[in-house]
Amino acid sequence: MLSLHCCNILQRYCFMTEFESKHGQVSTPPYQLYMSFTDMRNFVSMLPADRRNDVQADFDTITASIQGFNIGVKVHERVPYSRIELVDWGAPLAFHIVLYFDPGSGDNAYGTDFHIKVEAELNLMMKMMLGGKVKDALDKIVDTLVDASHGKMPEGFDPSQFDPSRFGGGSGV
């Protein structure tokens, strides 16, 4: 899908650019992992306490102030235990995010094949500046989720600030 729009600031053409993460084998069943992501308030629970003040969330939306920019995400569609689609909501650029919760296979038959796809409206300069960083960030999210499903927490993560009951019965991710 390629759309052509005039950017309001730079007056240059923007194109829908697609980024896709690698696939990660999460050791949690799709239904359980999916339920962790359905409520946007769960994302606030994962933040350190000192960062939560800049983030507001309800079931369908989450907004934050990041380096002076307000950015928001809204759930566009939920397909139970399969995917969640998010769209920009008050963000300075148009984007669409899809989180996939596919059934695992082989050694991970009871787990989830998790991956993320992002489409963002970027001009050529922004695409060149951000392209690799977006892909790296998506891959890091997948790796962190896979590691967490195997009991390895990210560096600097303080479990005492995490409320696992928000993620379906206290079992964590």
Model regions: which residues?
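Short, highly charged C-terminal tails/helix-capping segments
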Residues: V146-V173
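Intrinsic-disorder/low-complexity, polar/charged segments enriched in Ser/Thr/Lys/Arg/Asp/Glu/Gln
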Residues: T17-H23, T61, N70, H96, ...
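Hydrophobic pocket/interface hotspot
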Residues: L33-F37, F43, I62, V75, ...
